[in-house]
Each structure stands twice: as structure tokens, then as C-alpha cells.
Amino acid sequence: MTAPANNTPAAAATDTSVAALHDKILIVDFGSQVTQLIARRVREDGVYCEIVPFQKAEAAFRQMNPKAVILSGGPESVHEEGSPRAPQLIFESGVPVMGICYGQMTMAAQLGGTVEGGHHREFGRADVEVKTNSLLFDGVWQPGEQHQVWMSHGDRITQMPPGFSVAGVSPNAPFAVIQDEARKYYGLMFHPEVVHTPDGAKLIRNFVRNISGLGGDWTMHAFREEEIKKIRAQVGQGKVICGLSGGVDSAVAAVLIHEAIGDQLTCVFVDHGLLRLNEAETVVDLFRHHYNIPLVHVDASKLFLGELAGVTDPEAKRKTIGRLFIDVFEAEAKKIGGADFLAQGTLYPDVIESVSFTGGPSVTIKSHHNVGGLPARMNMKLVEPLRELFKDEVRVLGRELGLPDVFVGRHPFPGPGLAIRCPGEITTDKLDILRKADAIYIDEIRKAGLYDTIWQAFAVLLPVKTVGVMGDGRTYDYVVGLRAVTSTDGMTADFYPFDMKFLGNTATRIINEVKGVNRVVYDVTSKPPGTIEWE
């Protein structure tokens, strides 16, 4: 969620006290689609890092004083006039530098090498032959071995900068890995951050720990303690309102803030009538009775379902739900009165996007349901305790705070809820059918021990009826679609390969136990070309 600049902390991703407390790495973003994966790999090693677009990198470097720098990949060509460059200050500072793909190319060009447009492009899996020992390869690769990596490049180095030597080659990249170990400079033409480079995380760890000498002092326990101090300093004696969606992000934010300021926090849970089976009761019980957090529970289901009657366009559904949520939340906040701050579950990817490489908006695939308009309308300051964390780190923090794993480990659930899992017009009867089918599906997944393996699973009620036979009678009922995907970040996803026995058993249960369904299908579409949700 993004709020107006005058109410948010400074837009630059480096504006945080965490950077001042820990050893850190600066990641200079040249526009790669997988730059966030670099940060996740670094943080997995217990080292704090931040992603900054190349245009802001010099200021960020001066402010952060990082112990090392990683230059990301990117879509540009180094030999083209006006292509992005790393601040020369980085190479003059004496800190270790690792360049990945485009980062390797610009490092080579800036340090006196030659880069040309590649005559032999490499995209996808490739094999790198190790030519010499390297601190980067220590304990991972040995000279003479070949290892699978993931390439995505068009340029290539034709002459190395002074002081560099070749550490690895590939069939189309004679300088696949280059190094200047005296200055601790390393360039990789492949992407170590992606899972398709099996040893990539180990190579990054060698750069972070062994080459850069960072000890890994950034833990979730430390983050918790530091963030509590920050919240107390920011809020003082003020009152905070937090909108609960029933999801993990807002729940973790609320529990952390409550630990910091106690009953100065009031949570507002708007039940729009589009939640999963028994979900509203679970949220109310968790916050009211387990954590004793002041909670206002608003049952606005009749309002939402009334406004959604006859609405079939998915974007219209999302916008209607978002508008009503803001109206209801604002009304409840006025009833509470005296609140100075609004808490939001903003995550680090949202912050990165706001200071993105391009500086402009991405193509809107689907509008996002959030309360981003609330701060401007209500003249409230933001409290965003999760703005330095990725989604997987939020789950770790949730466990650190004692949230039950069955809650913290739940699959992602969209803000518009079941409205976008019920294509076409939404009715109470359709929602009842969908809730029951979804609950059976998730129950079967849990019983099979697959819930934590699957990134996201859910049922969809299709706006289609088909002929069936039950007993001696003809039926004409709805079709339920089942969706399950594996993913690391939700950006790409593959359908989960259930065995046919599981699918058969699940379909049988749904048809036998849910009145109004006579057919079940399984969605085997990956992302791309499809999206995870159907609407």
C-alpha cells in the first residue's frame, strides 16, 4: 500500500534506522526482474541489505556506508550510449563488489575492459566450467568441474579490465566468471540468485560472509526489539488504528504494534461477507481472546453483497469492495475518535516499487485492494512496522511473536476475498457453495501433508452448470475448479502435480457433501501465461 508522500516515511528505500544498526550490503538495481531474489538470498545469510535504483545509488552509498555492494542484472545493453552505470564512488571506496549479468558488464566497462553486443546469446540453463580456484567458489566448486547455471545475457566481455582473471567459462561466454581478488571484485555472467543455479545461494553466501567478512548479525529477534523501540518513539502517547483483513501481514503488524504500545492500538476488522468458512470467527477469537487486543468487529456483509449484486466485471468488483471498505473503515475510525496514526502492513517489495528502476508505473494486470486512500482522507500518519521485510520474513516474525503456525503459515488470500473466486455475479448461495467446497479441498490437502509444500490452493465456483446423474435422477448443477500452485514469491508459479487418486477423492467428497455441485475440474495452468487467481 502506498500513501501520500507527506504522510509516509521518506520515499527512499534507505531511510531506516535498521541500516545504521547492522552490517549491510547495498544492492544497486539496474532493472532486473529478479533483483529482489538477490536481497532474499543475502538476508537468508543474516545480513541486512537494501535495494536502490542506480539513479539513487550514490546518495544511498554515502548514507548507508555499506560493507559490500552487489550490482544487479538488467535489460539494457552496456555498449549502447547512455546505458546505466554504477557510481564510480563504489569502485573508489575499497569495498567488495559483485556484479551479476548486466552488473558484471558495467563493472568491466567502467574499470577499463571492453564489452560488445553478443554474437552468441545465452538464455536459460548453461554449464560453467571452473578454470581456477576462487574465494567465491570455496567449498562449492573445484577447478575442472562443470556446474549448471542460469544465463540471460546478450552482451559479452571481449577484453577484461586490468587486474582481472578468468575463473569460469561457458560455451558462449569465455568470461562467465571474472575476478580481481586483490580488490575483491567478482563478476558473474549468470544469475546466482535464481533457483535454476543450484549452487547460487552458496556462491552469494561466500561473497557475503567469506569475502566481505560480514558476520550475519541481522536476526528476526533483533528486528523485533528494534522495531518495538521505533514504534514507541514514533507514536509516543498517541492512538493507533489498524485495519485487519484476516491476512498474515496485517495480523503480524497488529501484534507487533500491540507489543510496543498496548491498548493505544485499536484494530478494526471489517467482515465484507467474502471470507472463507469460519474465518471471521477465527480472527475475532485470535485477537480478542488470545492476544487481548482491542478489536472492533464490523459485520458489513449485507452492505457489500448488496452493492455487488449484479456486478460481474472483476475490476468493478475490486473497485466496489475497495470503495466500501474505505467508507466503512473511515466511519468506524470516527466512532473510535482521537487516533493519530494508521497502521498498515506495507512490505519491502511495496517500498522497492515506489522507488523503482523505471520510476514509472507498471502495466496494471489487476488493481490491488488496499486502504491506500485512507491516510490522505483521514489526515493520519502512517505506522508501517513491516516495511523492511519480505513476505517470508513476515512469517518468521509472526512465529517470533508467537502467532500460531496454522495462522502464520496460511496461504495468501486476496483482499476482495471470494468475490474473485466466484466469476460472474455473486450471490449468498454461490458463496455458501464455494466456502464448503474450498474447506473440503483444503482439508484434503492438509490430511495429505501437502499444505506447507503448496504456495496457494483454493476452489473456484465457475459460472457454468452442467448435466449430471445422481442416483436415478438428472442434475444440472455448478462446476467447481480446483487450483494449487508452487512458487517462491508469487511472481511465477507452476501448478501442483497432484496424483489422480487425491484429485478423485477430493472431487468425490465435494460432489457428495456440497449440494449444488456435480462436476469438479483441476486447473493445470502455470503463471505465466495465467495468473494465480482467476479474476
Swiss-Prot record:
GO terms for cellular component: cytosol. Coiled coil: none annotated. It catalyses: XMP + L-glutamine + ATP + H2O = GMP + L-glutamate + AMP + diphosphate + 2 H(+). Keywords: ATP-binding, Glutamine amidotransferase, GMP biosynthesis, Ligase, Nucleotide-binding, Purine biosynthesis. Gene3D superfamilies: 3.30.300.10, 3.40.50.880, HUPs (3.40.50.620). Signal peptide: none annotated. ATP binds at residues 245-251. Residues 218-410 form the GMPS ATP-PPase domain. One of its GO terms (molecular function) is ATP binding. It is an enzyme of class 6 (ligase). It holds the Pfam family NAD_synthase. Pathway: Purine metabolism; GMP biosynthesis; GMP from XMP (L-Gln route): step 1/1. Homodimer. PANTHER family: GMP SYNTHASE [GLUTAMINE-HYDROLYZING] (PTHR11922:SF2), GMP SYNTHASE-RELATED (PTHR11922). Catalyzes the synthesis of GMP from XMP. This is GMP synthase [glutamine-hydrolyzing]. It comes from Bradyrhizobium sp. (strain ORS 278).
